[in-house]
Curated annotation (Swiss-Prot):
Name of the protein this chain belongs to: 4-hydroxy-3-methylbut-2-en-1-yl diphosphate synthase (flavodoxin)
Family: Belongs to the IspG family.
Functional description taken from the UniProt entry: Converts 2C-methyl-D-erythritol 2,4-cyclodiphosphate (ME-2,4cPP) into 1-hydroxy-2-methyl-2-(E)-butenyl 4-diphosphate.
Alphabetical keyword list: 4Fe-4S, Iron, Iron-sulfur, Isoprene biosynthesis, Metal-binding, Oxidoreductase
Record has Calcium as a keyword: no
Gene symbol of the encoding locus: ispG
CC cofactor note: Binds 1 [4Fe-4S] cluster.
Class in the EC hierarchy, top level: oxidoreductase
E.C. number: 1.17.7.3
Pathway annotation from the record: Isoprenoid biosynthesis; isopentenyl diphosphate biosynthesis via DXP pathway; isopentenyl diphosphate from 1-deoxy-D-xylulose 5-phosphate: step 5/6
Signal peptide: none
Keyword Oxidoreductase included in the entry's annotation: yes
Native source organism of the sequence: Marinomonas sp. (strain MWYL1)
GO biological process, one term: terpenoid biosynthetic process
GO molecular function, one term: 4 iron, 4 sulfur cluster binding
Length: 370
């Protein structure tokens, strides 16, 4: 299917997180956060590399102590992907990691301290050309805002953000992005919508503490999907109580589904029924596992019978339609070959990899010509 996305993205200014542009019409970047002990350098580096291999543009690392800041120095030297240092409570930690090549500083206005401390972080960031993320969170609002509103609300999140915006403007510092996160979908969406209409700074999207792999994926897909459909968002993190690699995969699935970015295989598969001529679920599981390394955008249809099989298969780069006695493989909308149930996964994998290689070569030729 070739229906174009109707989404018109919100205009925002652009900042650079390392070599990744955020805002200003740049592709929506996908990021995650390590959940290792930062002082365990080997484990943290290994996880960052796994996250990067999954397709991350940016990785955030928690820096809860000066020891972690010293570990960050070694981590920074070991990986090339842009790194964000997540700082809470102690502003001096931000000053320390700034010396070690961090690409962005995340500070929480609810716990970073008074204006003098914020000024120190801003002055350091300006000197070293490091952007800042103002990360407002419903679970850690300033005490006076908690008292004023009684509980976290969209307006409380927005007011917290504007306090920092005003002070950053007073300091003539504009290299920053914002996030206004809550675990409640409605609160988060309303807060982002309110602030998006009033400022042009890039926005980092997320539903904080969304839950485990299944529930967190659902919550994040609804909340972030609503905002992305509105054209709001310049970078995103799907927060899951799961392996961070899953956060990257879900984030890419969201962007692919909304036709905002494309990476890897877009599988179209039927849920299967008694009409299926092969085991659709088993086939899909095997294909997803085998083809996880492919990054070139492709559409692959796996349909178990002739009801919708030929129609869906014709719209895909590679399509499989169940049939008897043999199943039919389509390529670029045309019947290509027949395959038996016993060999269909191997046959599909071979054709998909060949097609992916051709697409990569075509893309390389286009780049060379330009």
């Amino acid at each position: 299917m070739h229906f174009e996305s109707p989404i018109k993205r919100r205009h925002s200014r652009q900042i650079m997180v390392g070599n990744v542009p955020v805002g200003g019409g740049a592709p929506i970047s996908v990021q995650s956060m390590t959940n290792t002990e930062t002082c365990d350098v080997d484990a943290t580096v290994a996880q960052i590399r796994a996250i990067a291999d999954a397709g991350a543009d940016i990785v955030r690392v928690s820096i809860p102590s000066m020891d972690a800041a010293e570990a960050f120095k070694k981590i920074r030297e070991a990986v090339s992907i842009p790194l964000v240092a997540d700082i809470h409570f102690d502003y001096k930690i931000a000053l320390k990691v700034a010396e070690y090549g961090v690409d962005c500083l995340r500070i929480n206005p609810g716990n970073i301290g008074n204006k003098d401390r914020i000024r120190a972080v801003v002055d350091c960031a300006r000197d070293k050309n490091i952007p800042i993320r103002i990360g407002v969170n419903a679970g850690s609002l300033e005490k006076d805002l908690q008292k004023k509103y009684g509980e976290p609300t969209p307006d409380a999140l927005v007011e917290s953000a504007f306090r920092q915006i005003q002070y950053f403007d007073e300091l003539d510092f504009h290299e920053y992005k914002l996030s206004l996160k809550a675990s409640d979908i409605f609160m988060t969406v309303e807060a982002y919508r309110k602030i998006a209409s009033q400022i042009d700074n890039p926005l980092h999207l997320g539903i904080t503490e969304a839950g485990g792999l299944r529930s967190g994926t659902v919550k994040s897909s609804i909340g972030l999907g609503l905002l992305l459909m509105d054209g709001i968002g310049d970078t995103l993190r799907v927060s899951l109580a799961a392996d961070p690699v899953h956060e990257i995969k879900v984030g890419w699935d969201m962007l692919r589904s909304l036709k905002l970015r494309n990476r890897g295989i877009n599988f179209i598969a039927c849920p299967s029924c008694s009409r299926q001529n092969f085991d659709v679920i088993k086939t899909m599981n095997e294909l997803e596992e085998r083809l996880d390394d492919i990054t070139i955008p492709m559409d692959v249809a796996v349909i178990g019978c002739v009801v919708n099989g030929p129609g869906e298969a014709k719209e895909a780069d590679i399509g499989l339609a169940g049939g008897s006695p043999n199943n039919l493989i389509y390529q670029d909308g045309k019947p290509d070959s027949k395959t038996k149930n016993e060999t269909l996964v191997d046959d599909l994998e071979r054709m998909i990899r060949k097609k992916a290689l051709l697409k990569e070569q075509e893309l390389a030729n286009i780049i060379v010509k330009n």
